[in-house]
């Protein structure tokens, strides 16, 4: 058995079957020769694998989600005296019986879910790394660039788009005393979105923010004239970029996110 060959057959990459076989074989004091046969889509390939397995006195372990392919392999392998073990089929059948739901029978579902998960994590990490203008290099790497003055929901919107839409978002705060990074004028205007808010709304938000920090709401940060100065600066920058501006004064994060997603989909950017 030390030199026993095991053919791992799958209609996808075969990682699931490979891991299960290795886990099972790990319980024995020998290391078999595991050979993966991925992306099997036709009975011709199965017939060939059965023939090779027979000549090598090998075991076949498989994850095939389509019933006809599973049945073909089991039947033909039995005819040739080849042991074939169905790793996932019995479990799919049992779940169908218990739930009364019909399986999708789609190969590679787990891998697609994994890819989506890691894409989300990557987007979240990107949003954190390039939050609040920390690194201007992120502007040119981003799927979306948000610009606006303080307290216009840039950070929560960036996180929402990362979590729910898997978009890499950089956000840049605009302050009259600081020139915007040059990268902001180099990025495609279709990727850039300005977040606008009314002076009165922002005045209220900033006063509440100061109160929550135990500070006086009479600080310059919440002064209406200062706010208007910042908004004028914002208007000047977005006019130069010529990007889309969204009024977030009375919008929930989800609403603003949907506007952005619809805009980029209409432009077929992704």
Swiss-Prot record:
Enzyme Commission number(s) from the entry: 2.7.11.32, 2.7.4.27
Enzyme class: transferase
Positions with a binding annotation for ADP: 148-155
Any matching Pfam family: Kinase-PPPase
Role of this protein: Bifunctional serine/threonine kinase and phosphorylase involved in the regulation of the pyruvate, phosphate dikinase (PPDK) by catalyzing its phosphorylation/dephosphorylation.
Family: Belongs to the pyruvate, phosphate/water dikinase regulatory protein family. PDRP subfamily.
HAMAP family xrefs: PDRP (MF_00921)
The protein, known as: Putative pyruvate, phosphate dikinase regulatory protein
Source organism per UniProt: Bacillus cereus (strain 03BB102)
